[in-house]
Amino acid sequence: SGSVIVQGGVITNTGLIPASASVGSTTAFSSTTAAYSSSTFDSSNNKIVVAYADNNGYGTGVVGTVSGNTVSYGTPVVFSTNFSYYTSIVYDSANNRVVIAYQDAGNSNYGTAIVGTVSGTSISFGTAVVFNAAYTQSIGIGFDSNANKVVIAYRDVGTSYGTAIVGTVSGTSISFGTEVVYQSSNSEYNAVTFDSSNNKIVVAYTCAATNGTASVGTVSGTSISFGTAVAFNPTRSSNYLSGAFDSNSNKVVLYYSDSPTAAIGGMCVVGTVSGTSISFGTAVAVGTSTSSSFTALSFDSSVNKIMMAYRGYFSGTYLGRLAVGTVSGTSITVADAITFNAANSYYISLAFDSNANKSVLSYSS
């Protein structure tokens, strides 16, 4: 295999209805192979932070600064010299820290988390903490800004159950409560979204029992409880799940590859939280590719649009694609997708910079 350059591009919404998008210049944030990239916005420092596994498999973080339609990056900082898979990052706005959850392959594949502190264009890390002393996969992470807690959802490989745990950041460390099972079936592609209107955590996932499914969680202290799971795509697997909260319409939006009949650029669906349950509108197709994978979402609050990126397949070629959606009631309208990278694009993530009013798209190519 050759070296893969990981690049970040700034996506600028034009505000058209239905919304389309324009793409700024591309900047490398790593000069080596990278995988499992995940990104977030640090609003206290007005920085984008990307977490990923570098060419050695080392867990790495890098800080980006948006200026106009470009993004520049500081020097990458290693947070783990073990192979670090399933990296997922979130910003803790109560403590002004980022938290990265990952599978530590050098420590029996345990689920592990670490706290990062941004300073200027660099980032420093505390000591890693194990949150699941068992083989851990398919990690998603979110932040509950009402309870001021981090929530990590993951597949515990020993049981294959979908499991969640609440984390409390203190300084440069994090401690955890007791894990809670939200799905007693094989749970994959766990995506965590916080609904700030209802102060609920929504975990979306695909499982053998009910395929595309979501569970609503309520954080109390250092624990979380879940309502009854609701299927949003009950007949087929919903892979490469991602989620975002539209704070204008107060809706959760999910984006996924509709397997095994993914003859389109994936599907998106609008969810409405009520109490400890969630209901869904009708799923809408995204793009026109013959398959989709590596989906990513962000909400652009400056124009109230959902940005959605994915890897699409067209006549033997993989392309990086981008579309924009507008939520209305329980439905979403999606504009025609554009190409942001005319080459194979994977490990895609999106983060909205509310200072610059731009969504930063990170990907491998």
Placement of each model-derived feature along the sequence:
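Intrinsic low-complexity, repeat-rich intrinsically disordered segments enriched
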Residues: S1-P18
